[in-house]
Amino acid sequence: MYENLLPRFLRYVKTETRSDATSTTTPSTQTQVAFAQTLKKELEELGMSDVIYNETNGFVIATLPSNVEKDVRSIGFIAHMDTADFNAVNVSPQIVENYDGESTIPLDKEGKFTLNTKDFPNLKNYRGETLITTDGTTLLGADDKSGIAEIMTAMEYLINHPEIKHGTIRVAFGPDEEIGVGADKFDVAQFNVDFAYTMDGGPVGELQFETFNAAQAEITIQGKNVHPGTAKNTMINALQLGIDFHNALPADEVPEKTAGEEGFYHLAAFAGTPEEATMTYIIRDHNREIFEARKAKIKEIQQTLNAPFDEERIKVDLFDQYYNMREVIEKDMSIVEIAKQAMEELSIQPIIEPVRGGTDGSKISYLGIPTPNIFAGGENMHGRFEFVSLQAMEKATNVIIKIAELNAK
């Protein structure tokens, strides 16, 4: 249906654009800067207007002007350029046409890694479809290059089909979503839309307007290391204090034991020696009150464990990352209803459920543009088992076009 969609997607995923959490630049990697320039050129060649690369925040933005005389709300469509922290060098996508919904798909030549319905029962949903997989050595990058390809293809289609009426549409492709800072510098005034959607969801039908509230705790523990043979009543083992800290948290409130709207504490890093140790926690909850209570629990444990000492052995740097965008979006649910209607008119069953994570839309919503999240089609993201269906990407492209059309009525 969209002859350029698959070639466009394959071209994008072969471009390495991982973000780097240790970087102090925006974008965090030069590969993203180069990719942004490539996308800027492509947008210009499509015939989009006001194409800009913002060097301050790393976003490429462009405008498709309205082709209706009446005033209608302006819409934004957003996707991110970076991929997750997994090998993304020399991505070599494989194409499996007319998948039968049952067979095992070998990824690497040795057959060490496979996509099979035992481990990935979601494969059964793709009978008769064209799957794009990895070769087992890298991720694919459908998160979120499928979103970029879908937005780009939808804009191309609308430009080539002026009979489809729409208001002003703006698109934005940004950096560093995977490391949680992509939208920190997003320029709401420059983007200038009434509402937007991130095309960054998973399987067909996903429509999300509720995310976690998110915080991070960086913990530094100062021990006192002496020879173990003479350590009694003298040694303060920073590693043991770290273990004590972790054990003071609720044992069942961790990612591997929670689902749905249950929040958690996640020990993301723990390193050190008896002399000094560091820990990183991410704290997540959909409920704002429980979220605040979780942060308070971290501080309470710090105070309890510091109490026996004559100095502060445990220091906590606790900071918020993003908030549940539902608090913003529920003030005007019409933007969710438009997306829902678009899917239903395309015979797509909307799957409306909270995101157990965040999106760029989480921050952009609080910056002033309500921004729900729509499926982009990918499955098993962030690793070698990632795949996407061509038909899923076509459906996402259809949804973008249908939203634009419905908004203009």
Swiss-Prot record:
Amino-acid positions noted as binding Zn(2+) 1 in the UniProt annotation, renumbered to this chain: 80, 143, 200
Biological process according to GO: peptide catabolic process; proteolysis
Reactions that this protein is recorded to catalyse: Release of the N-terminal residue from a tripeptide
EC number(s) on file: 3.4.11.4
Cofactor list: Zn(2+)
InterPro entries: ArgE/DapE_CS, Bact_exopeptidase_dim_dom, Peptidase_M20, Peptidase_M20_dimer, Peptidase_M20B
The keyword Ribonucleoprotein belongs to this UniProt entry's keyword annotation: no
GO cellular component annotations of the record: cytosol
Pfam family, one: Peptidase_M20
Residues engaged in binding Zn(2+) 2: 143, 178, 382
Catalytic residue positions: 82, 177 (proton acceptor)
Superkingdom of the organism of origin: Bacteria
Protein's UniProt keywords contain Ribosomal protein: no
PROSITE patterns: ARGE_DAPE_CPG2_1, ARGE_DAPE_CPG2_2
A molecular-function term among this protein's GO annotations: metallopeptidase activity
Main location as per UniProt: cytoplasm
HAMAP family documented for this protein: Aminopeptidase_M20
Family in the record: Belongs to the peptidase M20B family.
Function in brief: Cleaves the N-terminal amino acid of tripeptides.
Protein name: Peptidase T
Gene, per the UniProt record: pepT
